[in-house]
Design a protein with these regions (language model features):
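Glycine/proline-rich low-complexity spacer/linker segments in large multi-domain proteins
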Residues: 415-438, 543-586
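Aromatic-lined ligand-binding clefts that engage carbohydrates, nucleic acids, or primary amines
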Residues: 484-510, 518, 537-541
Length: 589
């Protein structure tokens, strides 16, 4: 067993230091950098943190559905955090279900989940070259989201990518905040770690490996610290019986210097190196560090400036060191979060992972009497949050998130004289002051499909329910126009709310572009563009290819207007909601 352990460790070390680091060094000679995903399914022979740590850049991966991403992105972000890498990429939205049916609103919550886990550099998967403009939607495969010029919503994809850029930028600022470092052990091959005991809600963690502990980790101000500045409050050892003496000696030094370490004692060395003396060293060190612990009872052992914690769950351990949750909210809420910190500023990313509106209080562990702001990555707006209060160790802020909405809660402005500001509510009541009833003049982009260039709708409907099959199966761009009279009698910001659109839209008001919508709350701020009296609104909507592909399944092949290399849509499939569905309202907040 020791020989096998040494061979496996040798393989992992050589893959990391000869293959990855070797390729990195050669690349640098030619002005290049290496980028890799630090895992591999169906036969990964390395240790994921060490393997990724030797590369210049690191990446994870997730699909728009399913399980892929459950371990890959934490593997990448932990590697990036402990090895001091600013950008942590992810091959994103790798597959999106059936061809040409997915659109950015369906991708958002999944992407936000992994932003909260530490991803901060989005790599879109994928863009396939299209050799022809006539064969649409064109070349595709069974995998991959169709981020290419022949997709119907490509002209409005900037609404989505601007969002991704804003989130990426914010999450690249400062350093990641995590309270716990879970040691993954020294065994190989290894593609992920375990969080045992489990971390309570409101805390973040990273995995950490022996290389970084032994070489880089030190104690500063009672915190486990890495050279690039990231700090942890507790180092958790895995439930294993083995550890090399060299590593256990470093753990001992960390504790005596003031660190908090938690876990069970090792019994012997896993390696054949210096056997049997190494086992005796382990027994001697373990006896010193776990002084008389019986293996079951809770025990706190004081060693130098630090402590060894035994027989505890994570909540008990965190309570012992008076470590409050980094963020606290109702545990039943479907919210994920991440936290970055730079000098004088705390940046929290929060995401509603549900399809429901959420109104809740959140307690943030911030110091120095900082005032909160909400930075909206969808539209770039900044909202002062006037309504907040002091808690034990932080600030409580009433918050509101629309379905699948995300936001940055930024603390950067210090309050004078420690006075809490009480003014307007954070989220004033939204009041509808006008409904745009039409009629609506609607233009279709593609007249080659037998559509009239313009039709008039007395009222908005889901086009997939239109009695005209050509309209019902339409895919592409269409423009809605109407006039309306408005006189403003309210105080507050005015919004044009589309409420329900299939699937994305850009809006012009009085010939001025005022923004686009692709996710909740599907509204744009028109305060600076709406006038008293007559107004003209023009809304450019894009659908997906799904309905046209289904419609063509009713046609003989020679009569079809679409061509896709991989197309499994049939007559039996349901149509997707399409067009401007509404109701369209003017709201004041």
């Amino acid at each position: 067993d020791r020989f096998l352990w040494d061979v496996r460790r040798l393989v992992a070390d050589r893959i990391a230091y000869d293959y990855v680091a070797g390729l990195r060094d050669v690349s640098h000679k030619y002005g290049l950098h290496t980028w890799l995903e630090n895992y591999g399914h169906w036969g990964f022979p390395g240790e994921f943190l060490q393997y990724g740590g030797q590369s210049d850049e690191i990446g994870g991966e997730f699909w728009s559905f399913g399980d892929l991403g459950n371990i890959e992105n934490r593997a990448a972000s932990s590697c990036g955090h402990i090895y001091g890498k600013k950008c942590i990429s992810a091959e994103s939205f790798t597959s999106a279900g059936r061809p040409f049916s997915c659109f950015p609103a369906q991708m958002k919550a999944r992407g936000d989940r992994f932003f909260a886990e530490g991803i901060n550099n989005t790599l879109l998967h994928l863009y396939i070259s299209q050799p022809s403009d006539e064969r649409v939607p064109g070349v595709n495969s069974w995998f991959g989201s169709e981020f290419n010029r022949l997709n119907t919503w490509f002209s409005q994809m900037d609404l989505f990518t601007i969002y991704l850029k804003r989130v990426n930028f914010m999450l690249q600022q400062g350093l990641n905040v995590a309270d716990v470092a879970y040691f993954i052990g020294e065994d190989t091959p290894k593609m992920t770690g375990i969080t045992e005991p489990e971390l309570p809600l409101g805390y973040q963690y990273d995995f950490i490996n022996a290389e970084v502990i032994e070489r880089d980790l030190f104690v500063k101000d009672g915190l486990l610290t890495l050279p690039h500045g990231i700090q942890y409050r507790i180092l958790v050892l895995p439930p294993l019986q083995t550890m090399r003496p060299e590593l256990l000696k470093k753990v001992k030094k960390l504790i005596y210097d003031g660190a908090i370490v938690m876990g069970n004692p090792p019994i012997y060395s896993p390696s054949g190196k210096n056997y049997p003396q190494a086992d005796e060293q382990i027994r001697k060190l373990a006896k010193e560090l776990w002084k008389g612990w019986n293996g079951t009872d809770k025990k706190i052992i004081k060693l130098g400036k630090g402590h060894m914690l035994c027989g505890m769950n994570m909540e008990e351990a965190l309570n012992f060191i008076n470590c409050l949750p980094d963020i606290k909210f109702d545990r039943n809420l479907p919210i994920v979060y991440g936290h970055r910190k730079l000098e004088g500023t705390d940046i929290y990313f929060i995401s509603n992972q549900s399809n429901d509106n959420l109104n809740f209080d959140a307690d943030f562990r911030v110091k120095n009497w900082m005032r909160p702001e909400l930075w909206n990555p969808v539209d770039g707006s900044i909202r002062e949050l006037h309504e907040f209060s002091e808690t034990k160790g932080g600030i409580r802020v009433p918050l509101k998130l629309y379905p699948q909405e995300s936001a940055f809660i930024v603390f950067s402005k210090r309050m004078k004289n420690a006075e809490f500001f009480f003014g307007n509510r954070n989220f004033p009541e939204v009041k509808t002051v006008k409904i745009l009833k039409g009629p609506w003049k609607m233009n279709f982009q593609d007249v080659k499909r037998g559509l009239p260039y313009t039709i008039t709708l007395d009222s908005l409907i889901d086009l997939s329910k239109h009695k005209n099959d050509t309209i019902r199966f339409y895919s592409g761009m269409l423009t809605y126009k109407t006039n309306f009279t408005f006189y403003n009698k309210e105080e507050g910001r005015l919004y044009l709310n589309l409420n329900n659109v299939g699937v994305m839209a850009k809006v012009k008001l009085n010939k001025h572009y005022v923004g686009g919508v692709w996710t909740y709350p599907y509204r744009v701020d028109v305060t600076d563009y709406i006038v008293d009296g007559e107004n003209i609104v023009e809304i450019e909507v894009v659908t997906t290819w799904q309905n046209r592909l289904i419609g063509d399944s009713f046609q003989e092949e020679k009569n079809r207007t679409t061509w896709a290399q991989f197309n499994n849509w049939t007559k039996q499939d349901s149509l997707q909601s399409s067009g401007l569905i509404g109701p369209i309202t003017i709201d004041v907040e």
